[in-house]
Amino acid sequence: MQNIFKLSCLVLAVVLSSAAWAQIAVKVDGGWARATVQGQKATGAFMKLTAPQATRLVAVSTPVAGVAEIHEMKMDGNVMKMRAIAGLDLPANQAVELKPGSYHLMLMDLKAPLMKDSSVALTLTFKDAKGVETKQQVSVPVNTGMPQAAGHQHADHKH
């Protein structure tokens, strides 16, 4: 009887640790959203995502916009085109950068201007290889342009 109890505890521990592994958050670095002006109805949000295991970014939502989508910018002949994509693969332990002119989050039908030095709450939805979806809340600052990396400020350079 004692062996059955020990085995049950071991099985429960394995199941719980597997569930905890599935809930490990995707690392979000350098997130920001581009500030807008009165009347502007869309903007982009950018960040670097690193997943501890292969997953896919499948959706984004935010209270500041009526529509939020995952987009990519891509050359089509000599023309740069932007389009919504169904999802973005995040390979295990490889940073995927969402940046201007590339993959990004498009926030459309803005409910109010995004002011510099404010922040935007985003809910990122990921789906793993087993089809399990997890949601992750992030807050990103609003800036007028891409923030400079620490130690790489160029504002004072004269060219």
Enumerate the predicted regions with their spans.
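Bacterial N-terminal signal peptides that target proteins for export
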Residues: 1-9
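Short, composition-biased local secondary-structure segments
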Residues: 10-11, 23-25
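Hydrophobic core
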Residues: 12-17
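Sec/Tat signal peptide C-region and signal peptidase I cleavage site
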Residues: 18-22
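Compact, glycine-rich, soluble single-domain proteins
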Residues: 24-159
